[in-house]
């Protein structure tokens, strides 16, 4: 059996809903603002399922780092194996540039060659989030300076 918990900030960001329903025996839908499914976080639904007696051999978490961090914190509490799919910046795909460097179990790993899937209980999410924020200012600037070719009005 496959149980899926899918979460989005709001209804207008929902993707792959039908695909999750087709691949799952149970789907819990969560949104931060309550415009889709149940208002709350994926960890709320996961905790509820576990505490209601559902047994899981493995949890797979894919999404924002902060979400995966707290899914792992929860599953560790219940001793449930958890795999996370890490997607840091990958430049050359060989591990030589170090752009996708992660700390997993106290060791340096490269998502492009060693992953992208890792034991979530061993990933240092704080370091991964810190590294992920490296280009935040550059990305914000790129959004602000985006091409206005399709804008109705250019200021």
Feature-to-residue mapping (PLM):
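Iron-sulfur (Fe-S) cluster-binding modules
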Residues: 1, 16-27, 47-56, 117-155
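Short, basic, helix/turn surface patches
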Residues: 32-37, 57-62, 108-118, 135-136
């Amino acid at each position: 059996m496959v149980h899926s918990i899918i979460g989005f900030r709001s209804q207008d960001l929902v993707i792959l809903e039908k695909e999750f329903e087709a691949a799952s025996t149970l789907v819990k839908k969560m949104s931060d603002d309550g415009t889709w499914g149940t208002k709350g976080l994926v960890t709320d639904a996961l905790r509820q399922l576990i505490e209601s007696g559902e047994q899981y051999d493995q949890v797979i978490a894919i999404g924002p780092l902060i979400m995966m961090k707290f899914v792992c914190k929860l599953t560790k509490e219940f001793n449930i194996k958890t795999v996370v799919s890490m997607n840091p910046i990958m430049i050359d795909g060989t591990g030589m540039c170090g752009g996708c460097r992660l700390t997993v179990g106290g060791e340096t790993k490269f998502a492009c060659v060693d992953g992208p899937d890792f034991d979530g209980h061993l990933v240092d999410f704080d370091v991964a989030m810190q590294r992920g924020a490296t280009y935040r200012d550059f990305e914000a600037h790129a959004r602000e300076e985006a091409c206005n070719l399709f804008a109705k009005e250019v200021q």
